[in-house]
Structure formats: structure tokens, C-alpha cells
């Protein structure tokens, strides 16, 4: 069954037979057609949730927020190759963490804007500004959530993540990068590949 989400230009594909190897609730984007058959790109899983306080951020909300921040990178000739997320409650208050793998798209004599703290901090606030009212209230008013953090990881980190999860039983044919991670070994792997850490420089906009 196909259910179009027109406002996001996404399609949700539901197949209990497993024919297309997607889980019930996966959100897909139609990227083209082969004859009359639609071709899909996996976007996210609908029901995965990040939560620190009363906030509840599902995977589609996170995807939409990251998409906004990606545009900042693309305008500076950088490409977000992969990402995932977790909540870090080792700090008080806890906060959202995004793991990003980025590469430069500069070619030839095209000058690249340095991938510096200011650029990554602007991505942090772009993500937060795109999250929902409850998250922004918790951040800006209640102070029950700390500033969002982006951790850059070295090239190949997400390939290593796939190898780890497949070794733990995930099917390599059906593997999709999880957008929210709770597994201790997976988080330890990603944290061991971190090359830089950047936090949102201010509170997101919030009004009563």
C-alpha cells in the first residue's frame, strides 16, 4: 500500500509480505520510475524516538530538521554522507547528539570554506530551530534539555557501523543506517571515530 505524504514529497510504503524489504512504517521518497514501477530511497523509520524530557522527536521530524541543516553545508560545498543520533544523559541536563560524516565537494580551483566551528554551530542551531514546539520550549524556557551537539566522525565510520550491526545479526541485504542508536557497542564505535564536537551556540527561538 502506498500512502503519499504530499507536504513532504515522501511516500510511505507498507508491505506485510516483506516483498520490498522495508518495515511497516518506513518513510520512503520516490526518486524515479522504472517503466511504471516507482523507485524508492529510504528516508527514515517513523516510530523511532529521541526523548530527554517531555520532548518526543520521531525519526521523520529529525530527518526534516537535518535536511534544513544540510542546506547550510551544501551552500559551503560540503555533503552530509550519513548521520545518526542518540540522547546523551551523562550531562545535566541531557541533550541530543548527532553523528555526522561529511565530505567536501570542492573540485579543481574552487575554494572551500573551512569546515570550522562557526559553520557546524550554525548547523546545530538550524536543526534545533526546525524541531517542534515542545523541544524548543524545553531548551529555551524549561532548561530541561541541553544544547544540541554534532559530533563529526572520520571517513568510513558508518561503514564500520554497518559491519558491526551486520555481525550482530542485521541482514546486509536489508541494512539501512539506523537514525537513532541505543546500542552500547555501536555508540562506542562511533565515539571512537569522532574528530570534532560542536554545540548549538544559543537557544532556539521559542514564544509562549
Regions found by a protein language model. Name each.
Residues 1-208:
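AMP-binding adenylation
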Amino acid at each position: 500500500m502506498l500512502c503519499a505524504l504530499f507536504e513532504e514529497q515522501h511516500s510511505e510504503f507498507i508491505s506485510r509480505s516483506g516483498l520490498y524489504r522495508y518495515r511497516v512504517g518506513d518513510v520512503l521518497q520516490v526518486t524515479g520510475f522504472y517503466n511504471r514501477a516507482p523507485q524508492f530511497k529510504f528516508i527514515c523509520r517513523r516510530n523511532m524516538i529521541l526523548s530527554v524530557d517531555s520532548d518526543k522527536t520521531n525519526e521523520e521530524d529529525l530527518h526534516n530538521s537535518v535536511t534544513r541543516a544540510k542546506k547550510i553545508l551544501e551552500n559551503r560545498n560540503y555533503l552530509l554522507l550519513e548521520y545518526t543520533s542518540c540522547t546523551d544523559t551523562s550531562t545535566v541536563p541531557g541533550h541530543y547528539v548527532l553523528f555526522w560524516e561529511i565530505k567536501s565537494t570542492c573540485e579543481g580551483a574552487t575554494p572551500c570554506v573551512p569546515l570550522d566551528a562557526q559553520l557546524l554551530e550554525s548547523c546545530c542551531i538550524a536543526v534545533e530551530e526546525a524541531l517542534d514546539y515542545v523541544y524548543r520550549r524545553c531548551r529555551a524556557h524549561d532548561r530541561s534539555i541541553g544544547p544540541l551537539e554534532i559530533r563529526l566522525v572520520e571517513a568510513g565510520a558508518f561503514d564500520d557501523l554497518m559491519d558491526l550491526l551486520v555481525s550482530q545479526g542485521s541482514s546486509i541485504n536489508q541494512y539501512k543506517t539506523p537514525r537513532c542508536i541505543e546500542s552500547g557497542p555501536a555508540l562506542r564505535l562511533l565515539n571512537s571515530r569522532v574528530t570534532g564536537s560542536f554545540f548549538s551556540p544559543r537557544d532556539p527561538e521559542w514564544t509562549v
